[in-house]
């Protein structure tokens, strides 16, 4: 069994969760903070049999896509600076962990 821990932009998380659930892959969403742009991120905890891990990763990769956004230059500093800059947002970060023991009550 594997545990996929993935951090996904909130703009993509609902469609990723829906697609995983439609394939009968269980997923738990944990709101998380971090990053400096957009509405935020969510951390998904996905427990899967090893045979389903490639399918789960494919779904995440197809739906949590990186994209470009234009934001004010200096957006992350306390004093905004004039001008706009293009940055990359979205995508995902995933950790795949081996599970030695699992219990469900």
Residue ranges and their predicted role:
Residues 1-105:
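Positively charged, small/polar-rich N-terminal and surface patches that mediate targeting and assembly
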